[in-house]
Protein backbone atom coordinates (compact mmCIF):
# COMPACT_ATOMS: atom_id res chain seq x y z
CA UNK A 1 0.00 0.00 0.00
CA UNK A 2 1.34 3.43 -0.94
CA UNK A 3 1.82 6.10 1.70
CA UNK A 4 3.60 9.42 1.34
CA UNK A 5 6.18 10.47 3.90
CA UNK A 6 5.28 13.08 6.50
CA UNK A 7 8.01 15.70 6.38
CA UNK A 8 6.29 17.98 8.92
CA UNK A 9 6.33 15.72 11.98
CA UNK A 10 7.64 17.13 15.23
CA UNK A 11 11.27 16.34 16.01
CA UNK A 12 12.17 14.48 19.19
CA UNK A 13 14.75 15.47 21.77
CA UNK A 14 17.18 13.06 20.12
CA UNK A 15 17.40 15.13 16.95
CA UNK A 16 21.12 15.47 16.18
CA UNK A 17 20.71 19.19 15.44
CA UNK A 18 19.78 19.84 19.06
CA UNK A 19 23.01 18.23 20.22
CA UNK A 20 25.24 20.48 18.11
CA UNK A 21 26.91 23.69 19.10
CA UNK A 22 25.74 26.82 17.25
CA UNK A 23 28.96 26.87 15.23
CA UNK A 24 28.60 23.26 14.15
CA UNK A 25 24.95 23.81 13.25
CA UNK A 26 25.91 26.84 11.20
CA UNK A 27 28.49 24.83 9.26
CA UNK A 28 25.97 22.05 8.69
CA UNK A 29 23.41 24.47 7.29
CA UNK A 30 26.06 25.90 4.96
CA UNK A 31 26.95 22.44 3.66
CA UNK A 32 25.83 20.73 0.46
CA UNK A 33 23.54 18.51 2.56
CA UNK A 34 21.38 21.46 3.55
CA UNK A 35 21.12 22.59 -0.07
CA UNK A 36 20.27 19.03 -1.09
CA UNK A 37 17.59 18.84 1.57
CA UNK A 38 15.98 22.19 0.79
CA UNK A 39 16.28 22.27 -3.00
CA UNK A 40 15.92 18.60 -3.93
CA UNK A 41 14.89 16.18 -1.20
CA UNK A 42 11.72 17.94 -0.02
CA UNK A 43 10.60 18.38 -3.65
CA UNK A 44 10.71 14.69 -4.61
CA UNK A 45 7.19 13.91 -5.95
CA UNK A 46 6.48 10.68 -4.10
CA UNK A 47 2.95 10.42 -5.53
CA UNK A 48 4.45 9.50 -8.92
CA UNK A 49 5.37 6.12 -7.45
CA UNK A 50 1.86 5.29 -6.21
CA UNK A 51 1.06 3.04 -9.25
CA UNK A 52 3.89 0.73 -8.18
CA UNK A 53 2.05 -0.36 -5.04
CA UNK A 54 -1.17 -2.17 -4.24
CA UNK A 55 -4.34 -0.20 -3.56
CA UNK A 56 -5.47 -2.84 -1.07
CA UNK A 57 -4.92 -2.13 2.63
CA UNK A 58 -1.57 -3.70 3.41
CA UNK A 59 1.86 -2.96 4.81
CA UNK A 60 2.90 0.57 3.74
CA UNK A 61 5.93 1.24 1.62
CA UNK A 62 9.27 2.49 2.88
CA UNK A 63 9.79 6.28 2.48
CA UNK A 64 10.03 6.90 -1.27
CA UNK A 65 11.74 10.26 -0.84
CA UNK A 66 14.59 8.67 1.12
CA UNK A 67 15.06 5.88 -1.43
CA UNK A 68 14.97 8.20 -4.45
CA UNK A 69 17.14 10.79 -2.72
CA UNK A 70 19.73 8.13 -1.85
CA UNK A 71 19.72 6.91 -5.46
CA UNK A 72 20.42 10.47 -6.60
CA UNK A 73 23.34 10.72 -4.17
CA UNK A 74 24.63 7.33 -5.30
CA UNK A 75 24.66 8.48 -8.93
CA UNK A 76 26.09 11.90 -8.10
CA UNK A 77 28.96 10.65 -5.93
CA UNK A 78 29.65 7.39 -7.76
CA UNK A 79 28.91 5.20 -4.75
CA UNK A 80 28.47 1.46 -4.90
CA UNK A 81 25.41 -0.01 -3.19
CA UNK A 82 27.56 -0.96 -0.20
CA UNK A 83 28.95 2.57 0.08
CA UNK A 84 25.45 4.02 -0.18
CA UNK A 85 24.23 1.87 2.71
CA UNK A 86 27.30 2.86 4.75
CA UNK A 87 26.64 6.56 4.22
CA UNK A 88 22.95 6.13 5.01
CA UNK A 89 23.80 4.51 8.30
CA UNK A 90 26.78 6.49 9.57
CA UNK A 91 27.39 9.69 7.61
CA UNK A 92 25.81 12.70 9.28
CA UNK A 93 25.64 14.84 6.15
CA UNK A 94 23.96 12.11 4.12
CA UNK A 95 21.43 11.40 6.87
CA UNK A 96 20.70 15.10 7.34
CA UNK A 97 20.26 15.60 3.60
CA UNK A 98 17.75 12.74 3.53
CA UNK A 99 15.80 13.91 6.57
CA UNK A 100 17.15 11.24 8.93
CA UNK A 101 17.74 13.66 11.79
CA UNK A 102 17.26 11.27 14.67
CA UNK A 103 19.91 8.76 15.62
CA UNK A 104 17.21 6.11 16.06
CA UNK A 105 15.82 6.61 12.54
CA UNK A 106 16.43 3.50 10.45
CA UNK A 107 17.31 3.88 6.77
CA UNK A 108 15.75 1.55 4.17
CA UNK A 109 17.61 -1.72 3.68
CA UNK A 110 19.41 -2.58 0.46
CA UNK A 111 16.68 -5.11 -0.33
CA UNK A 112 14.17 -2.25 -0.30
CA UNK A 113 16.25 -0.43 -2.91
CA UNK A 114 16.39 -3.57 -5.07
CA UNK A 115 12.62 -4.00 -4.91
CA UNK A 116 11.88 -0.40 -5.92
CA UNK A 117 14.37 -0.56 -8.80
CA UNK A 118 12.66 -3.71 -10.05
CA UNK A 119 9.23 -2.10 -9.86
CA UNK A 120 10.39 1.06 -11.62
CA UNK A 121 11.92 -1.02 -14.40
CA UNK A 122 8.80 -3.14 -14.83
CA UNK A 123 6.61 -0.03 -14.86
CA UNK A 124 8.82 1.55 -17.53
CA UNK A 125 8.65 -1.60 -19.65
CA UNK A 126 4.85 -1.67 -19.42
CA UNK A 127 4.08 2.04 -19.83
CA UNK A 128 7.18 3.56 -21.44
CA UNK A 129 7.42 6.01 -18.52
CA UNK A 130 10.64 6.12 -16.51
CA UNK A 131 9.63 7.56 -13.15
CA UNK A 132 13.13 8.87 -12.48
CA UNK A 133 12.83 11.00 -15.61
CA UNK A 134 9.56 12.36 -14.23
CA UNK A 135 11.27 13.12 -10.91
CA UNK A 136 14.05 14.96 -12.74
CA UNK A 137 11.54 16.99 -14.77
CA UNK A 138 9.41 17.98 -11.76
CA UNK A 139 12.33 19.02 -9.58
CA UNK A 140 14.14 20.86 -12.37
CA UNK A 141 11.02 22.78 -13.42
CA UNK A 142 10.54 23.92 -9.82
CA UNK A 143 14.18 25.03 -9.61
CA UNK A 144 13.86 26.93 -12.90
CA UNK A 145 10.81 28.77 -11.60
CA UNK A 146 12.26 29.48 -8.14
CA UNK A 147 15.60 30.86 -9.34
CA UNK A 148 14.14 32.67 -12.38
CA UNK A 149 16.34 30.79 -14.84
CA UNK A 150 15.77 31.86 -18.43
CA UNK A 151 15.36 28.81 -20.66
CA UNK A 152 14.94 30.48 -24.06
CA UNK A 153 18.55 29.89 -25.08
CA UNK A 154 19.85 26.37 -24.58
CA UNK A 155 22.93 24.42 -25.56
CA UNK A 156 23.20 20.70 -26.08
CA UNK A 157 25.80 17.96 -26.23
CA UNK A 158 25.86 14.17 -26.22
CA UNK A 159 28.30 11.74 -24.63
CA UNK A 160 28.92 8.01 -24.66
CA UNK A 161 28.00 5.92 -21.61
CA UNK A 162 29.52 2.45 -21.44
CA UNK A 163 27.34 -0.38 -20.19
CA UNK A 164 28.60 -2.55 -17.34
CA UNK A 165 29.49 -5.44 -19.64
CA UNK A 166 32.72 -7.12 -20.67
CA UNK A 167 34.05 -6.41 -24.14
CA UNK A 168 33.55 -9.65 -26.08
CA UNK A 169 34.83 -10.77 -29.45
CA UNK A 170 32.49 -12.70 -31.76
CA UNK A 171 33.36 -16.15 -30.45
CA UNK A 172 33.11 -15.04 -26.82
CA UNK A 173 29.72 -13.50 -27.60
CA UNK A 174 28.18 -16.62 -29.14
CA UNK A 175 29.62 -18.86 -26.39
CA UNK A 176 28.26 -16.53 -23.68
CA UNK A 177 24.87 -16.64 -25.41
CA UNK A 178 25.01 -20.43 -25.56
CA UNK A 179 25.79 -20.62 -21.84
CA UNK A 180 23.01 -18.19 -20.92
CA UNK A 181 20.51 -20.10 -23.06
CA UNK A 182 21.43 -23.47 -21.53
CA UNK A 183 20.94 -22.02 -18.04
CA UNK A 184 17.30 -21.31 -18.96
CA UNK A 185 16.59 -25.01 -19.64
CA UNK A 186 15.22 -27.43 -17.02
CA UNK A 187 17.92 -28.80 -14.71
CA UNK A 188 17.88 -32.24 -16.33
CA UNK A 189 18.50 -30.77 -19.77
CA UNK A 190 21.21 -28.48 -18.39
CA UNK A 191 23.10 -31.53 -17.17
CA UNK A 192 22.66 -33.25 -20.54
CA UNK A 193 23.97 -30.23 -22.39
CA UNK A 194 26.83 -29.84 -19.93
CA UNK A 195 28.00 -33.40 -20.54
CA UNK A 196 27.60 -33.25 -24.31
CA UNK A 197 29.14 -29.79 -24.79
CA UNK A 198 31.64 -29.60 -21.95
CA UNK A 199 34.08 -27.74 -24.21
CA UNK A 200 31.81 -24.69 -24.36
CA UNK A 201 29.94 -24.90 -21.06
CA UNK A 202 32.54 -25.77 -18.42
CA UNK A 203 34.58 -22.54 -18.55
CA UNK A 204 34.05 -18.83 -19.09
CA UNK A 205 34.05 -17.62 -22.71
CA UNK A 206 37.31 -15.77 -22.12
CA UNK A 207 39.06 -18.90 -20.81
CA UNK A 208 37.81 -20.94 -23.75
CA UNK A 209 39.00 -18.44 -26.36
CA UNK A 210 42.28 -17.52 -24.70
CA UNK A 211 44.34 -20.43 -26.03
CA UNK A 212 42.70 -20.76 -29.44
CA UNK A 213 44.76 -19.99 -32.52
CA UNK A 214 43.38 -17.51 -35.02
CA UNK A 215 42.84 -20.13 -37.71
CA UNK A 216 40.66 -22.20 -35.34
CA UNK A 217 38.25 -19.39 -34.45
CA UNK A 218 36.06 -19.62 -37.56
CA UNK A 219 35.56 -23.36 -37.11
CA UNK A 220 34.40 -22.82 -33.52
CA UNK A 221 32.09 -20.03 -34.65
CA UNK A 222 30.44 -22.42 -37.09
CA UNK A 223 30.10 -25.13 -34.43
CA UNK A 224 28.64 -22.83 -31.79
CA UNK A 225 26.29 -21.31 -34.36
CA UNK A 226 24.83 -24.72 -35.14
CA UNK A 227 24.50 -25.41 -31.40
CA UNK A 228 22.61 -22.14 -30.97
CA UNK A 229 20.11 -23.17 -33.65
CA UNK A 230 19.56 -26.49 -31.87
CA UNK A 231 19.29 -24.75 -28.51
CA UNK A 232 16.75 -22.25 -29.84
CA UNK A 233 14.43 -25.05 -30.91
CA UNK A 234 14.65 -26.64 -27.47
CA UNK A 235 14.09 -23.33 -25.70
CA UNK A 236 10.94 -22.73 -27.71
CA UNK A 237 9.53 -26.19 -26.95
CA UNK A 238 10.42 -26.01 -23.25
CA UNK A 239 8.65 -22.66 -22.82
CA UNK A 240 11.77 -20.86 -21.66
CA UNK A 241 11.56 -17.15 -20.72
CA UNK A 242 10.78 -15.00 -23.74
CA UNK A 243 13.72 -12.67 -23.14
CA UNK A 244 16.19 -15.59 -23.38
CA UNK A 245 14.57 -16.82 -26.60
CA UNK A 246 14.76 -13.29 -28.01
CA UNK A 247 18.48 -12.95 -27.17
CA UNK A 248 19.39 -16.30 -28.78
CA UNK A 249 17.29 -15.45 -31.84
CA UNK A 250 18.94 -12.05 -32.20
CA UNK A 251 22.48 -13.41 -31.87
CA UNK A 252 21.81 -16.03 -34.55
CA UNK A 253 20.32 -13.37 -36.83
CA UNK A 254 23.17 -10.93 -36.12
CA UNK A 255 26.07 -13.33 -36.62
CA UNK A 256 24.82 -15.97 -39.08
CA UNK A 257 22.84 -16.52 -42.25
CA UNK A 258 20.30 -19.33 -42.29
CA UNK A 259 19.95 -20.99 -45.68
CA UNK A 260 17.35 -23.70 -46.23
CA UNK A 261 18.71 -27.25 -46.45
CA UNK A 262 22.31 -26.15 -45.86
CA UNK A 263 24.61 -25.60 -42.87
CA UNK A 264 24.54 -22.29 -41.04
CA UNK A 265 26.81 -19.66 -42.61
CA UNK A 266 28.90 -17.09 -40.75
CA UNK A 267 28.37 -13.44 -41.72
CA UNK A 268 31.30 -11.28 -42.72
CA UNK A 269 32.29 -8.68 -40.10
CA UNK A 270 31.18 -5.86 -42.42
CA UNK A 271 27.67 -7.32 -42.52
CA UNK A 272 27.12 -7.05 -38.76
CA UNK A 273 24.97 -4.09 -37.73
CA UNK A 274 25.82 -1.61 -34.99
CA UNK A 275 22.51 -2.59 -33.37
CA UNK A 276 23.63 -6.20 -32.97
CA UNK A 277 23.79 -7.77 -29.51
CA UNK A 278 27.02 -6.78 -27.74
CA UNK A 279 26.47 -9.01 -24.71
CA UNK A 280 23.73 -11.46 -23.73
CA UNK A 281 23.77 -9.79 -20.31
CA UNK A 282 22.68 -6.44 -21.80
CA UNK A 283 20.90 -6.98 -25.12
CA UNK A 284 19.90 -3.29 -25.33
CA UNK A 285 23.52 -2.07 -25.55
CA UNK A 286 24.67 -1.15 -29.05
CA UNK A 287 27.98 -0.36 -30.75
CA UNK A 288 29.30 3.02 -31.86
CA UNK A 289 32.65 3.87 -33.43
CA UNK A 290 33.47 7.51 -32.75
CA UNK A 291 36.70 9.47 -32.71
CA UNK A 292 38.69 6.33 -33.57
CA UNK A 293 37.32 4.47 -30.56
CA UNK A 294 34.63 1.82 -30.15
CA UNK A 295 31.89 2.14 -27.52
CA UNK A 296 29.45 -0.49 -26.26
CA UNK A 297 26.49 0.91 -24.42
CA UNK A 298 24.35 4.01 -24.64
CA UNK A 299 24.41 7.72 -25.40
CA UNK A 300 23.26 10.48 -23.06
CA UNK A 301 22.10 13.81 -24.44
CA UNK A 302 22.15 16.84 -22.13
CA UNK A 303 20.32 20.14 -22.66
CA UNK A 304 21.09 23.08 -20.41
CA UNK A 305 20.32 26.76 -20.21
CA UNK A 306 23.00 29.15 -21.47
CA UNK A 307 21.50 32.65 -21.40
CA UNK A 308 24.34 34.98 -20.31
CA UNK A 309 21.91 36.84 -18.04
CA UNK A 310 21.33 33.76 -15.87
CA UNK A 311 23.18 33.72 -12.57
CA UNK A 312 23.07 29.92 -12.57
CA UNK A 313 22.69 27.51 -15.51
CA UNK A 314 20.75 24.26 -15.11
CA UNK A 315 20.46 21.03 -17.06
CA UNK A 316 16.88 20.99 -18.35
CA UNK A 317 16.54 17.58 -19.99
CA UNK A 318 18.33 14.25 -20.24
CA UNK A 319 17.86 11.63 -22.95
CA UNK A 320 19.41 8.17 -22.82
CA UNK A 321 19.28 5.99 -25.91
CA UNK A 322 21.13 3.36 -27.89
CA UNK A 323 24.48 4.88 -28.84
CA UNK A 324 23.85 4.36 -32.55
CA UNK A 325 21.03 6.95 -32.49
CA UNK A 326 21.89 10.13 -34.40
CA UNK A 327 22.31 13.36 -32.45
CA UNK A 328 19.63 14.99 -34.58
CA UNK A 329 17.03 12.55 -33.28
CA UNK A 330 18.13 13.22 -29.71
CA UNK A 331 17.68 16.95 -30.29
CA UNK A 332 14.19 16.34 -31.66
CA UNK A 333 13.29 14.20 -28.63
CA UNK A 334 14.64 16.87 -26.28
CA UNK A 335 12.57 19.63 -27.89
CA UNK A 336 9.47 17.44 -27.74
CA UNK A 337 9.99 16.81 -24.02
CA UNK A 338 10.69 20.46 -23.22
CA UNK A 339 7.60 21.54 -25.16
CA UNK A 340 5.48 19.02 -23.26
CA UNK A 341 6.78 20.46 -19.99
CA UNK A 342 6.07 24.00 -21.30
CA UNK A 343 9.72 25.00 -21.04
CA UNK A 344 10.17 27.91 -23.46
CA UNK A 345 13.02 27.46 -25.95
CA UNK A 346 13.80 29.93 -28.76
CA UNK A 347 17.28 28.90 -29.86
CA UNK A 348 19.63 25.96 -29.39
CA UNK A 349 23.42 26.05 -29.73
CA UNK A 350 24.92 22.72 -30.82
CA UNK A 351 27.94 21.26 -32.57
CA UNK A 352 27.98 20.05 -36.16
CA UNK A 353 26.77 16.58 -35.25
CA UNK A 354 23.23 17.84 -34.66
CA UNK A 355 22.40 19.44 -37.99
CA UNK A 356 20.38 17.40 -40.45
CA UNK A 357 16.88 16.91 -41.77
CA UNK A 358 15.52 15.45 -38.51
CA UNK A 359 16.77 18.18 -36.18
CA UNK A 360 15.92 21.00 -38.58
CA UNK A 361 12.38 19.71 -39.02
CA UNK A 362 11.97 19.54 -35.24
CA UNK A 363 13.27 23.10 -34.87
CA UNK A 364 10.79 24.36 -37.47
CA UNK A 365 7.98 22.51 -35.73
CA UNK A 366 8.81 24.06 -32.34
CA UNK A 367 9.84 27.45 -33.83
CA UNK A 368 13.37 27.12 -32.48
CA UNK A 369 16.45 28.65 -34.10
CA UNK A 370 19.17 26.03 -34.60
CA UNK A 371 22.64 27.53 -34.08
CA UNK A 372 25.36 25.02 -34.95
CA UNK A 373 29.03 25.85 -34.44
CA UNK A 374 29.98 23.80 -37.51
CA UNK A 375 28.12 22.22 -40.42
CA UNK A 376 28.42 18.64 -41.61
CA UNK A 377 29.07 18.37 -45.34
CA UNK A 378 31.41 19.64 -48.03
CA UNK A 379 32.64 23.18 -48.56
CA UNK A 380 31.95 25.40 -51.55
CA UNK A 381 34.65 25.22 -54.20
CA UNK A 382 37.00 28.18 -54.51
CA UNK A 383 35.97 31.03 -56.82
CA UNK A 384 32.22 30.51 -56.37
CA UNK A 385 29.93 32.13 -53.83
CA UNK A 386 28.48 29.73 -51.31
CA UNK A 387 24.73 29.47 -50.97
CA UNK A 388 25.03 31.31 -47.65
CA UNK A 389 26.11 34.42 -49.60
CA UNK A 390 22.50 34.73 -50.78
CA UNK A 391 19.77 35.90 -48.42
CA UNK A 392 16.82 33.52 -48.28
CA UNK A 393 13.29 34.22 -47.06
CA UNK A 394 11.67 30.98 -45.89
CA UNK A 395 8.07 30.13 -45.10
CA UNK A 396 7.70 29.75 -41.32
CA UNK A 397 5.35 26.77 -41.60
CA UNK A 398 6.76 24.67 -44.46
CA UNK A 399 10.35 25.92 -44.52
CA UNK A 400 10.16 26.39 -48.30
CA UNK A 401 11.94 29.39 -49.91
CA UNK A 402 9.81 32.34 -50.96
CA UNK A 403 12.38 34.97 -51.97
CA UNK A 404 16.11 35.24 -52.56
CA UNK A 405 18.40 38.26 -52.58
CA UNK A 406 21.74 38.04 -54.37
CA UNK A 407 24.90 39.55 -52.81
CA UNK A 408 24.43 42.61 -55.07
CA UNK A 409 20.97 43.32 -53.69
CA UNK A 410 18.60 42.06 -56.41
CA UNK A 411 15.54 40.37 -54.85
CA UNK A 412 13.32 37.96 -56.78
CA UNK A 413 10.72 35.32 -55.96
CA UNK A 414 11.50 31.60 -55.84
CA UNK A 415 9.34 28.97 -57.57
CA UNK A 416 9.27 25.22 -57.43
CA UNK A 417 11.08 23.45 -60.24
CA UNK A 418 9.86 20.32 -62.01
CA UNK A 419 11.96 17.96 -59.92
CA UNK A 420 11.10 17.33 -56.28
CA UNK A 421 12.87 19.47 -53.65
CA UNK A 422 14.35 21.75 -56.32
CA UNK A 423 13.67 25.45 -56.84
CA UNK A 424 14.39 28.14 -59.43
CA UNK A 425 14.68 31.93 -59.22
CA UNK A 426 14.65 34.12 -62.37
CA UNK A 427 16.66 37.36 -62.23
CA UNK A 428 16.47 40.51 -64.36
CA UNK A 429 18.66 40.10 -67.43
CA UNK A 430 19.60 43.79 -67.63
CA UNK A 431 20.67 44.05 -64.01
CA UNK A 432 22.65 40.81 -64.20
CA UNK A 433 24.30 41.92 -67.43
CA UNK A 434 25.76 44.97 -65.69
CA UNK A 435 26.93 42.96 -62.66
CA UNK A 436 30.74 42.42 -62.53
CA UNK A 437 30.25 39.02 -60.84
CA UNK A 438 27.93 37.55 -63.49
CA UNK A 439 29.58 34.59 -65.26
CA UNK A 440 32.14 34.56 -62.42
CA UNK A 441 31.54 34.10 -58.67
CA UNK A 442 27.75 34.38 -58.96
CA UNK A 443 25.76 31.13 -59.15
CA UNK A 444 23.08 32.70 -61.38
CA UNK A 445 23.44 31.12 -64.82
CA UNK A 446 22.47 32.61 -68.21
CA UNK A 447 19.74 30.86 -70.22
CA UNK A 448 19.17 30.98 -74.00
CA UNK A 449 15.40 31.41 -73.97
CA UNK A 450 14.92 32.43 -70.32
CA UNK A 451 16.22 35.15 -68.02
CA UNK A 452 19.26 34.38 -65.84
CA UNK A 453 18.26 31.58 -63.48
CA UNK A 454 19.41 30.35 -60.10
CA UNK A 455 18.74 26.61 -59.61
CA UNK A 456 19.03 25.26 -56.08
CA UNK A 457 17.96 22.30 -53.95
CA UNK A 458 15.96 22.67 -50.76
CA UNK A 459 18.75 21.04 -48.76
CA UNK A 460 21.29 23.61 -50.01
CA UNK A 461 18.98 26.41 -48.88
CA UNK A 462 18.52 24.84 -45.45
CA UNK A 463 22.28 24.45 -44.96
CA UNK A 464 22.82 28.04 -46.13
CA UNK A 465 20.31 29.27 -43.57
CA UNK A 466 22.24 27.40 -40.85
CA UNK A 467 25.57 28.84 -41.97
CA UNK A 468 24.14 32.35 -41.82
CA UNK A 469 23.24 31.76 -38.16
CA UNK A 470 26.79 30.80 -37.20
CA UNK A 471 28.85 33.30 -35.20
CA UNK A 472 32.02 33.42 -33.13
CA UNK A 473 30.17 33.82 -29.82
CA UNK A 474 28.20 30.68 -30.64
CA UNK A 475 31.33 28.53 -30.36
CA UNK A 476 32.19 30.05 -26.98
CA UNK A 477 28.68 29.39 -25.69
CA UNK A 478 28.74 25.74 -26.78
CA UNK A 479 32.23 25.11 -25.39
CA UNK A 480 30.92 25.28 -21.82
CA UNK A 481 28.83 22.16 -22.38
CA UNK A 482 32.09 20.19 -22.24
CA UNK A 483 32.40 21.02 -18.54
CA UNK A 484 28.79 19.96 -18.02
CA UNK A 485 29.45 16.62 -19.67
CA UNK A 486 32.57 16.17 -17.54
CA UNK A 487 30.65 16.89 -14.32
CA UNK A 488 27.87 14.55 -15.45
CA UNK A 489 30.23 11.63 -16.19
CA UNK A 490 32.75 12.23 -13.40
CA UNK A 491 31.08 9.82 -10.92
CA UNK A 492 31.35 6.99 -13.46
CA UNK A 493 34.95 5.81 -13.73
CA UNK A 494 36.04 5.79 -17.36
CA UNK A 495 32.51 6.75 -18.41
CA UNK A 496 31.30 3.24 -17.53
CA UNK A 497 28.00 2.93 -15.71
CA UNK A 498 27.72 0.46 -12.81
CA UNK A 499 24.45 -0.85 -14.28
CA UNK A 500 23.08 -2.55 -17.39
CA UNK A 501 20.01 -1.94 -19.48
CA UNK A 502 18.55 1.24 -20.95
CA UNK A 503 16.06 1.85 -18.14
CA UNK A 504 18.59 1.53 -15.30
CA UNK A 505 21.11 3.58 -17.29
CA UNK A 506 18.58 6.40 -17.63
CA UNK A 507 17.84 6.24 -13.91
CA UNK A 508 21.54 6.77 -13.21
CA UNK A 509 21.74 9.55 -15.81
CA UNK A 510 18.84 11.44 -14.23
CA UNK A 511 20.40 11.12 -10.78
CA UNK A 512 23.75 12.43 -11.97
CA UNK A 513 22.11 15.35 -13.80
CA UNK A 514 20.14 16.29 -10.68
CA UNK A 515 23.39 16.36 -8.70
CA UNK A 516 25.08 18.56 -11.31
CA UNK A 517 22.25 21.06 -10.89
CA UNK A 518 22.40 20.71 -7.10
CA UNK A 519 26.11 21.51 -7.03
CA UNK A 520 25.54 24.61 -9.15
CA UNK A 521 22.73 25.79 -6.91
CA UNK A 522 24.89 25.20 -3.83
CA UNK A 523 27.71 27.29 -5.31
CA UNK A 524 25.18 29.98 -6.22
CA UNK A 525 23.59 30.05 -2.76
CA UNK A 526 26.91 29.80 -0.91
CA UNK A 527 29.46 31.64 -3.07
CA UNK A 528 31.89 32.05 -0.16
CA UNK A 529 31.83 28.39 0.83
CA UNK A 530 35.17 26.58 0.58
CA UNK A 531 33.49 23.17 0.58
CA UNK A 532 34.20 20.87 -2.34
CA UNK A 533 31.25 18.55 -2.99
CA UNK A 534 33.22 16.45 -5.45
CA UNK A 535 35.54 15.32 -2.69
CA UNK A 536 34.78 14.02 0.82
CA UNK A 537 31.07 13.79 1.55
CA UNK A 538 31.33 14.35 5.31
CA UNK A 539 31.74 17.58 7.24
CA UNK A 540 35.08 18.25 8.94
CA UNK A 541 36.47 15.39 10.96
CA UNK A 542 34.54 16.25 14.09
CA UNK A 543 31.30 15.36 12.27
CA UNK A 544 32.56 12.36 10.31
CA UNK A 545 31.18 8.87 10.87
CA UNK A 546 34.37 7.59 12.50
CA UNK A 547 35.13 10.60 14.68
CA UNK A 548 35.39 10.34 18.47
CA UNK A 549 32.56 12.87 18.80
CA UNK A 550 30.12 10.75 16.84
CA UNK A 551 31.01 7.48 18.58
CA UNK A 552 30.81 9.02 22.06
CA UNK A 553 27.50 10.70 21.22
CA UNK A 554 25.91 7.49 19.97
CA UNK A 555 27.21 5.53 22.97
CA UNK A 556 25.96 8.15 25.42
CA UNK A 557 22.43 8.20 24.03
CA UNK A 558 22.26 4.43 23.61
CA UNK A 559 23.20 3.97 27.28
CA UNK A 560 19.82 5.24 28.50
CA UNK A 561 17.57 5.38 25.44
CA UNK A 562 15.87 2.02 24.81
CA UNK A 563 12.75 2.62 22.69
CA UNK A 564 10.22 -0.18 22.38
CA UNK A 565 9.42 0.74 18.78
CA UNK A 566 12.02 2.23 16.47
CA UNK A 567 10.22 4.39 13.88
CA UNK A 568 11.37 4.17 10.29
CA UNK A 569 12.59 7.61 9.27
CA UNK A 570 10.22 9.20 11.79
CA UNK A 571 11.14 12.74 10.82
CA UNK A 572 10.17 12.06 7.24
CA UNK A 573 6.67 10.63 7.71
Which residues fall in each region the model found?
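Basic, low-complexity segments
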Residues: 1-56, 553, 559-565
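Anion-binding and metal-coordination hotspots
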Residues: 80-83, 102, 114-573
Amino acid sequence: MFRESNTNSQSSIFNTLWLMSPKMKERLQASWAHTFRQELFVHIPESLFAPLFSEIESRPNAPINIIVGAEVLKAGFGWSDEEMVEHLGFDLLTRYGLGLDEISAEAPTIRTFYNLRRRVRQYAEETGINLYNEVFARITDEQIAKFLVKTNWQRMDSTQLLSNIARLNRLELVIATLQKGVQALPEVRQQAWGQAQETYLSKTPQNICYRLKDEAVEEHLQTVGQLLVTLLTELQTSQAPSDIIEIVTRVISDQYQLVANSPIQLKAPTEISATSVQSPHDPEATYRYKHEQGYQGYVANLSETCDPENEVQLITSVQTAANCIDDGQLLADSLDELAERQVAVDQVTVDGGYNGATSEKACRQHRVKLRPTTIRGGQTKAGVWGWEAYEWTLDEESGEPRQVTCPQGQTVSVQRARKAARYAAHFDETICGDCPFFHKECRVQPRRHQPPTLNVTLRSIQVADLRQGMSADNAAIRANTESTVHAFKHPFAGGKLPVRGLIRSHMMACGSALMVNLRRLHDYLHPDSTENMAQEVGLPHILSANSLFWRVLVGFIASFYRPQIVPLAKSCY
